[in-house]
Amino acid sequence: RYATAALGAMDRPADAAPMVARLRAIDGTIDGTAAYLRRTYVDSAAARLMDGIRRAGFH
């Protein structure tokens, strides 16, 4: 999740594509990823990670 978010933050969605596919396999949907992050991190950290993950191409 960190690597996916980092690549998204650097506007490198092509490089993040394999990781986005893995997140889909693990979490199912973007909502599943968001739910995991909200349970695990404080709101501000979860929001920042989700921003990067969305920018990586996970919608």
What are the residue ranges of the model-derived segments?
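Alpha-helical protein-protein interaction modules
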Residues: 1-59
